Amino acid sequence: MTIDHVSFDVPEGSYTTIIGHNGSGKSTIAKLLAGLLEKASGSIRIDGLELNLENLAKIRSRIGIVFQNPDNQFIGATVEDDIAFGLENHNVPQADMQEIIKHSAERVRMTKYLHQEPTRLSGGQKQRVAIAGVLAMKPKLLIFDEATAMLDPQGKDEIKKVIMDIHQETGLTVLSITHDIDEIAQADYVIALADGQIVSTGSPEEIFFNEEKLKKIQLDVPFSMKLSAELEKQGIHTEKHITMEGLVEELCRYNSKM
């Protein structure tokens, strides 16, 4: 997908999501930021550095990226080996390495699996290992390219919680490419793409409470909002909620007052 005149900033310490229909250019942006694709024109700046051949190694050391297929990211023979892979490539002393591995595994709740082989892990556990490997390198920016897309519901929930916990506890900047409504709802800022261009930006509420904007990015109105509209027809007024959880909480309060 060609990216055309795309310009945006990701504030340091923020949780930003990029959304859009399949083929809108979301993953292309992730690969451009990681230096996996070369831009034809324009400029990309990360942590004050322009992305070019001279700065590529420095920038990659400040970025961690997790892709959607957990099987394609597991390199080591065990969980411990996989987390250690990047550290070994950077010649981190063995004594320091063990402490970093332990701390990174604790962050994603995989400490008891350090000696497990990848074949014994679920998809969600493999993604947690991928995140641990990224955290071990102490990046300033975490990029998740549809990291939950290939997981079952339990795995999705586990990864979303891990990502949010890391962001809240460390203050790391997170850029997540996702279709997940629950994840988008928790973001500070949303960038909406369509056909390689940015068509809308703003808070989750600004994007999802505007049906015209949703049509532009070819996304459906969240089910919670459709249900609210039907309840309104029955004389039950509710606030707009992006997620079902928010709507259910309001309905419970409504029921307790009856």
Annotate the PLM regions:
Residues 34:
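Helix-to-loop junction immediately C-terminal to a conserved catalytic motif
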Residues 95-113:
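Conserved ABC ATPase "signature" region
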Residues 138:
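Conserved catalytic motifs of ABC-family nucleotide-binding domains
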Residues 42-50, 59:
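Conserved ABC transporter NBD signature motif
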Residues 117-121, 125:
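Conserved ABC ATPase signature
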Residues 142-145:
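Catalytic Walker B motif of ABC-type/P-loop ATPase nucleotide-binding domains
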